[in-house]
Swiss-Prot record:
It comes from Bacillus subtilis (strain 168). It comes from the Bacteria. The gene is ybfK. The lineage of its organism: Bacteria, Bacillati, Bacillota, Bacilli, Bacillales. Its EC number is 3.1.1.1. It catalyses: a carboxylic ester + H2O = an alcohol + a carboxylate + H(+). This is Carboxylesterase YbfK. Keywords: Cytoplasm, Hydrolase.
């Protein structure tokens, strides 16, 4: 009886999440198509926009935010690229996991599968927070697949989290904890769109062990070593917000600037962790300027 109740709660909370996700996609300002591709870790949900014959840009979202978070950026970027907003498998989104991804090597293999399923030999990459860390990891493990990379507010990667990250993460058990977490990372300078906030709350309340990314020793979050960062050969644009809550952005900026060859790193004023949402106009143009410099 208890098991049946738990399964019912998981299904019910999952349906609420899917409904909230679809509602948040009403913010998507341009035509798109959604589909799944097969990987060794399960079916990965992707939202594609832009001309099919344009260069490819793969987008990786922040944890709990799903691909819906790209709504303020997608029109600008899809004017020059065929964009693929990928739901990171194992997080709260529409991807359907069938096997656990536990290591950084696993995550890189998953991304290779996504490339292969899309028929892409190479692509540009852009990601925020968790998605940004995935990109740094992929640059080390499959640099030949990446043209240029944009890393925004990466989750660790260059410097350890502030202890408050784990305090707020431990409280992510319901609506109140989710709202507290969102308020913490946005501060007083930005209000998340109610539809996106509702989706995040629904994700936190979704009782699904397969969609619950947990820290692991060989997974994420992770601070890359000096040797790893020095070995990056792909052109990288790295962006932080001046009001970053999760770590000391100036220290991360300085470490990246010293270690990563040729990196373009900057700290953007009047923004925090959710840089692409908080300052979309600036981020959109800066990313296009950087990426279009690498179109062959």
């Amino acid at each position: 009886m208890i098991q049946d109740s738990m399964q019912f709660a998981a299904v019910e909370s999952g349906l609420r999440f899917y409904q909230a996700y679809d509602q948040s996609l009403s913010l998507w300002p341009i035509e798109s198509e959604a589909f799944y591709v097969s990987t060794r870790f399960g079916k990965t949900h992707i939202i594609a926009s832009g001309p099919k014959d344009a260069p490819s840009l793969i987008l990786l979202h922040g944890g709990l935010f799903s691909s819906a978070m790209w709504y303020p950026n997608i029109a600008a970027w899809s004017s020059q690229f065929r964009t693929y907003a990928v739901d990171i498998i194992g997080d709260k989104n529409k991807s359907i996991p069938s096997a656990a991804m536990e290591t950084r090597a696993d995550f890189a293999e998953w991304m290779k599968d996504v490339f292969d399923s899309l028929g892409l030999e190479t692509a540009h990459l852009a990601g925020l927070s968790l998605g940004g860390s995935h990109i740094v990891n992929f640059l080390l493990r499959a640099p030949e697949r990446v043209e240029r990379a944009v890393v925004i507010s990466p989750a660790e990667a260059f410097i350890s989290f502030h202890p408050d990250v784990y305090k707020y993460a431990a409280e992510l058990t319901g609506a109140r904890g989710a709202e507290s977490y969102i308020k913490w990372i946005t501060g007083d300078s930005y209000d998340l769109h109610p539809l996106l906030q509702r989706q995040i709350v629904a994700g936190v309340e979704w009782q699904d062990e397969q969609r619950s990314l947990k820290p692991t020793e060989n997974g994420f979050p992770y601070v890359f070593t000096d040797q790893e960062l020095k070995s990056i050969q792909v052109p990288v644009l790295l962006m932080f917000g001046e009001h970053e809550a999760m770590y000391h952005q100036q220290m991360a900026f300085e470490r990246a600037s010293v270690l990563v060859p040729g990196i373009q790193a900057e700290i953007v004023k009047n923004a925090g962790h959710l840089l692409s949402l908080e300052q979309p106009e600036y981020v959109n143009q800066r990313v296009l300027s950087f990426l279009c410099g690498g179109i062959k």
